[in-house]
């Protein structure tokens, strides 16, 4: 009957004291062979063999206890010969033989060799007469001993598959049970030592120094974001978490992880159901813009993060509904997604670029036409004004100079209509020819004398005076030059 095989021991080699590689490889091969034989012994051992060796004498137990003390040392060269190794270097690096292996697997491997020495079938019964008297109990059971106090090995020690199962005595059963407990304690100690110490554990250790705090939940102290871990992070932590739970049940007979395990299982189921869930209005259609999709993604991440956030082993209030079903959670997440959903906006139709350019070009053309018309009309007005105002042949007037000259001409006409300027006209008619510009000053001074009397006589005789334009232009030129001369003297 095949029994359940225990966890194979893990052997760690301490190679810090070994400077040469061949010795290390040779020692490693020996350890591997010992482990393989130990595994076969575990597989072939059964619980029905426990009742077959109860009739042995009490001095055999004392003899086996004496052999257990001798088995703590390294195997002898004769035992290496049983494995087929004929040459063994006796190199001494000042290291005890029991320190070759750095972990508890060394004792396990050596105790296995002790079990094989004591579990031999009746194949060497002929050599029982050569054994010392102290080993008669073992000789009666079919074992042979050499000169070093060790039993000589035969092919029956390693043929674990034929001839039934190995004969194991009750003392061997106790030794195997002790080895299993040592291995479990060693593995539990390694796992606990490498667990990180958190602030909560330190605080609980200070408040309760007699109670040793352990990390009951790998997710209660470490909150990883959704972007860094994959979707199946519950399956990632599950094997390690189950292993720790089994070991703690064997040592403490407690079940502290059932609540957190149920929460992780519910979280995984909710994540898978939410990933497969699609809202009523699909975001893949053209009815929504890119900003709407971003808002829905943000709402989905918030819903998932609220589920994955565990505060001291208690789920967030968003996940604690009345019935605790996934449907209520999905309804809440859908409502949160609708809250972030923006209403549709209908924008006015914008004209194309070609229409905008055509309209702009038409406006520019019309503005240019109006500007040209305004400039042309202004130029025509200045030309007509220059024709009306008496000018000299040497005048090259700008628009501003033309306007100033026009104001002076208007002032001259106002003075001509007064009483004093009428006498000037009479003096000009008396002279007959307007050839001398130098006598203009004398004429103006003479006109000042008796202007009023002359004006009255002229009005009575002829009525309103009629002055031809040529005479006005001549008089304006004389008056203009006289004004410029006075301005320069001043």
UniProtKB/Swiss-Prot annotation:
Sites of Phosphoserine modification: 325, 328
GO cellular component: cytoplasm; nucleus
Source domain of life: Eukaryota
Tissues where the protein occurs: Expressed in embryonic abdomen; a single cell ventrally, pairs of cells laterally and three cells dorsally in each hemisegment. In the thorax, there are patches of cells associated with the imaginal disks. During larval development, cells proliferate and, in the abdomen, they form ventral, lateral and dorsal clusters, which are the precursors of the adult abdominal muscles. In the thorax, they form populations of cells in the imaginal disks that correspond to the adepithelial cells.
InterPro entries, A to Z: bHLH_dom, E-box_TF_Regulators, HLH_DNA-bd_sf, Twist-rel_bHLH
Gene Ontology biological process terms in this record: actomyosin structure organization; developmental process; ectoderm and mesoderm interaction; gastrulation; gastrulation involving germ band extension; heart development; Malpighian tubule morphogenesis; mesoderm development
Disrupted gene: phenotype observed: Embryos fail to form the ventral furrow at gastrulation and lack mesoderm and all internal organs.
PANTHER family per the UniProt record, alphabetical: BASIC HELIX-LOOP-HELIX TRANSCRIPTION FACTOR, TWIST (PTHR23349), PROTEIN TWIST (PTHR23349:SF50)
Protein's name according to its UniProt entry: Protein twist
């Amino acid at each position: 009957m095949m029994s359940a095989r225990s966890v194979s021991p893990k052997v760690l080699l301490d190679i810090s004291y070994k400077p040469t590689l061949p010795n290390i490889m040779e020692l490693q091969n020996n350890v591997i062979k010992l482990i393989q034989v130990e595994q076969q012994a575990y597989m072939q051992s059964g619980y029905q063999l426990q009742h077959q060796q109860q009739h042995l004498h009490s001095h055999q137990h004392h003899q086996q206890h004496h052999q257990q003390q001798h088995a703590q040392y390294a195997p002898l060269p004769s035992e290496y010969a049983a494995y087929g190794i004929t040459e063994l270097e006796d190199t001494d690096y000042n290291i005890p033989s029991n320190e070759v292996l750095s972990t508890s697997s060394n004792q396990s491997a050596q105790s296995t060799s002790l079990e094989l020495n004591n579990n031999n079938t009746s194949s060497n019964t002929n050599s029982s007469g050569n054994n010392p008297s102290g080993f008669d109990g073992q000789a009666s059971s079919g074992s042979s001993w050499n000169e070093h106090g060790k039993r000589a090995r035969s092919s029956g020690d390693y043929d674990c598959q034929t001839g039934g199962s190995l004969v194991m005595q009750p003392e061997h059963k106790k030794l195997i049970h002790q080895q299993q407990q040592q291995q479990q304690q060693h593995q539990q100690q390694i796992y606990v030592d490498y667990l990180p110490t958190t602030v909560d554990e330190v605080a609980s250790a200070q408040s309760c120094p007699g109670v040793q705090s352990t990390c009951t939940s790998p997710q209660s102290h470490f909150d990883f974001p959704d972007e860094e871990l994959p979707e199946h992070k519950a399956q990632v932590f599950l094997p390690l978490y189950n292993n720790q739970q089994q070991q703690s049940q064997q040592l403490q007979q407690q079940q502290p992880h059932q609540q957190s395990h149920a929460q992780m299982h519910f979280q995984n189921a909710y994540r898978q159901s939410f990933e497969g869930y699609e809202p009523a209005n699909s975001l893949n259609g053209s009815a929504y813009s890119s900003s709407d999709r971003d808002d829905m993604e943000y709402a989905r991440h918030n819903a998932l993060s609220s589920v994955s956030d565990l505060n001291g082993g208690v789920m967030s209030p968003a996940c604690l509904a009345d019935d605790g079903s996934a449907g209520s959670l999905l309804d809440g997440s859908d409502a949160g997604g609708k809250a972030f959903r923006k209403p549709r906006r209908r924008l006015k139709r914008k004209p194309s670029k070609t229409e905008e350019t055509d309209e702009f070009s038409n406006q520019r053309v019309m503005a240019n036409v109006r500007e040209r018309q305004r400039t042309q009309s202004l130029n025509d007005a200045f030309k007509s004004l220059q024709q009306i105002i008496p000018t000299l042949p040497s005048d090259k007037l700008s628009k501003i100079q033309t306007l100033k000259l026009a104001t002076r001409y208007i002032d001259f006409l106002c003075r001509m209509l007064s009483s004093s300027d009428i006498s000037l006209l009479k003096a000009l008619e008396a002279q007959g020819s307007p050839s001398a510009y130098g006598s203009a000053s004398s004429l103006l001074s003479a006109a000042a004398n008796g202007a009023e009397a002359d004006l009255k006589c002229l009005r009575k005789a002829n009525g309103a005076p009629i002055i031809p334009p040529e005479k006005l232009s001549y008089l304006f030129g004389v008056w203009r030059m006289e004004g410029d001369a006075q301005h320069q003297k001043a």
